[in-house]
Amino acid sequence: GLIDVRCYASRECWEPCRKVTGSGQAKCQNNQCRCY
């Protein structure tokens, strides 16, 4: 789901999502990170 991390590129979300979900799968959606 969405996490409270601002972004411009999906790769900016990989590390934050890995910390939250343990998965590096992420996308930047509407300038906010979404983890899968």
From Swiss-Prot:
Disulfide bonds join 7-28, 13-33, 17-35. InterPro entries: Scorpion_toxin-like_sf, Scorpion_toxinS_K_inh. It holds the Pfam family Toxin_2. GO terms for cellular component: extracellular region. SUPFAM superfamilies: Scorpion toxin-like (SSF57095). The record marks 36 as: Aromatic residue of the functional dyad. It is found in: Secreted. GO terms for molecular function: ion channel inhibitor activity; potassium channel regulator activity; toxin activity. PROSITE patterns: SCORP_SHORT_TOXIN. Its main location: secreted. Has the structural arrangement of an alpha-helix connected to a beta-sheet by disulfide bonds (CSalpha/beta). Poorly competes with (125)I-kaliotoxin binding on rat brain synaptosome (IC(50)>100 nM). Is a poor Kv1.3/KCNA3 ligand. May have as real target KCa1.1/KCNMA1 channel. Shows weak toxicity on mice. Belongs to the short scorpion toxin superfamily. Potassium channel inhibitor family. Alpha-KTx 16 subfamily. This is Potassium channel toxin alpha-KTx 16.9.
